Amino acid sequence: RGDEVLTFVNRNLEPYRGYHVFMRALPDILAARPKAQVVIVGEDGVSYGKRPEAGGKWKDIFLNEVKDRLDLSRVHFTGRLPYDRLVDLMHVSRAHAYLTYPFVLSWSMVETLAAGTLVVGSNTAPVAEVIKDGVNGRLVDFFDIKGWSDTLTDALARPEAYVQMRQNARDMTRAKYDLRSVCLPQQIALLTRLERS
């Protein structure tokens, strides 16, 4: 985590998962952190919301909105990554932005916490159930673009200030979401109860 790598991951880059908010925060982040590199993972389709009414793709619409204020040589769109490469990316990421409307939490956020990456998440129901602000990550109001810029800039600038939060995130993930010791036994117990009833 020696490099200032900021990540954003979604199946598809669309408003439902906060792509528009993240892109609007990027110009100030990159202006404040001239060595930062941004890796954006996701395809340009739609998974949860609807397609743009005027046509086109959400990825391009929100990139075009801010591209004149970005150094595009520092913004890297990867498309979809296989699981192992995504996990590798989380291990080099200094900070990860995770936004979602109140909806199902993505498995990738849990994987990111498990990797010990600082997650700055939207203060929405599914995220706030997992991240406790200042304890195992940071929370920012979904539409607070300045809050996103400031919080992500600080995370890139002062990684030492977040060491304990990253460790707490790893510990919490292992304690609550480990497949072998927690999730699988709970699923088996649930199926056993259902079978008996």
Protein language model regions, located:
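Conserved donor-binding/catalytic core segment of Leloir-type glycosyltransferases
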Residues: 1-17, 23-28, 39-41
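Acidic donor-binding loop of glycosyltransferase active sites
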Residues: 8, 91-104, 117
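Nucleotide-activated donor-binding/catalytic signature segment of Leloir-type glycosyltransferases, i.e.
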Residues: 45-46, 51-80
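Short alpha-helical donor nucleotide-sugar binding micro-motif in glycosyltransferases
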Residues: 80, 88-93
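Short alpha-helical segment that forms part of, or immediately flanks, the ligand-binding pocket
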Residues: 87, 106-114, 128-129, 135
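Short hydrophobic beta-strand element within catalytic cores of glycosyltransferases
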Residues: 118-121, 131
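Conserved acidic donor-binding segment of nucleotide-sugar-dependent glycosyltransferases
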Residues: 133-134, 138-145, 154-159
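C-terminal alpha-helical cap of glycosyltransferases
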Residues: 158, 179-197
